[in-house]
UniProtKB/Swiss-Prot annotation:
Cofactor or coenzyme needed: Fe(2+); Ni(2+)
Note on cofactor: Binds either 1 Fe or Ni cation per monomer. Iron-binding promotes an acireductone dioxygenase reaction producing 2-keto-4-methylthiobutyrate, while nickel-binding promotes an acireductone dioxygenase reaction producing 3-(methylsulfanyl)propanoate.
A single BP term in Gene Ontology: methionine metabolic process
Inducing stimuli: By submergence in root tips and lateral roots of seedlings. Down-regulated by water deficit.
Source taxon at top rank: Eukaryota
Keywords from the UniProt entry: Amino-acid biosynthesis, Cytoplasm, Dioxygenase, Iron, Metal-binding, Methionine biosynthesis, Nickel, Nucleus, Oxidoreductase
Membership in a protein family: Belongs to the acireductone dioxygenase (ARD) family.
Protein name per the record: Acireductone dioxygenase 2
GO cellular component: cytoplasm; nucleus
Chain's gene name: ARD2
């Protein structure tokens, strides 16, 4: 399943190493010179990604196949923008605090765009830009954070295995079993394979 629905993925998902600037989090934060990384590097970190048809997601057979294969039984849609998200500034601040989850974080961008920041094996930040049509799965136990870009809008589908649980564990939470498993499978082994869903 990880190797399907890849055509044109680079048009909706892009990744690069971030600078250390404290400027507005919604800016791209490229290093100078820019250091783009291949999406295969994300796979090495356990991240799954696909390009799907966001204009017809209700009838998209590819989305259905992914959901069935990975057990994503629950779905909802959220708009993240100042006009539609209550307590917008506080929520965005929470999303941008570095954290992990004990389950996968699955997001499918239906409209707009945003940034998922993840850590590589050397604890360096990688910024993953996701646009309309991009679907990304961050493995359980991976430290990450999210922010909008300067357009200040994303409409995202959230997917879950079973009941929706979004519990962030802010760094450090290295003692959690999900983190230990992620470190063992990805970090200690040099990131050679995607983490399988439980």
């Amino acid at each position: 399943m990880e190797n399907q629905f890849q055509d044109g993925k680079e048009e909706v998902i892009e990744a690069w190493y971030m600078d250390d600037s404290e400027e507005d989090q919604r800016l791209p934060h490229h290093r100078e010179p820019k250091e783009f990384i291949p999406l295969s590097k994300l796979s090495e970190l356990g991240i799954l990604s696909w390009r799907l048809n966001a204009d017809d997601w209700e009838n998209d057979e590819n989305l259905k196949k992914i959901r069935e294969a990975r057990g994503y039984s629950y779905m909802d849609i959220c708009d993240v923008c100042p006009e539609k998200l209550p307590n917008y500034e506080a929520k965005l601040k929470n999303f941008f605090e570095e954290h992990l989850h004990t389950d996968e974080e699955i997001r499918y961008c239906l409209e707009g765009s945003g940034y998922f920041d993840v850590r590589d094996q050397n604890d360096q930040w990688i910024r993953v830009a996701v646009k309309k049509g991009g679907m990304i799965v961050l493995p359980a136990g991976m430290y990450h954070r999210f922010t909008l870009d300067s357009d200040n809008y994303i409409k995202a589908m959230r997917l879950f295995v079973g009941e929706p649980v979004w519990t962030p564990y802010n760094r450090p939470h290295d003692h959690l079993p999900a983190r230990k498993e992620y470190v063992e499978k990805i970090i200690n082994r040099g990131g050679t394979q995607a983490v399988e869903a439980r």
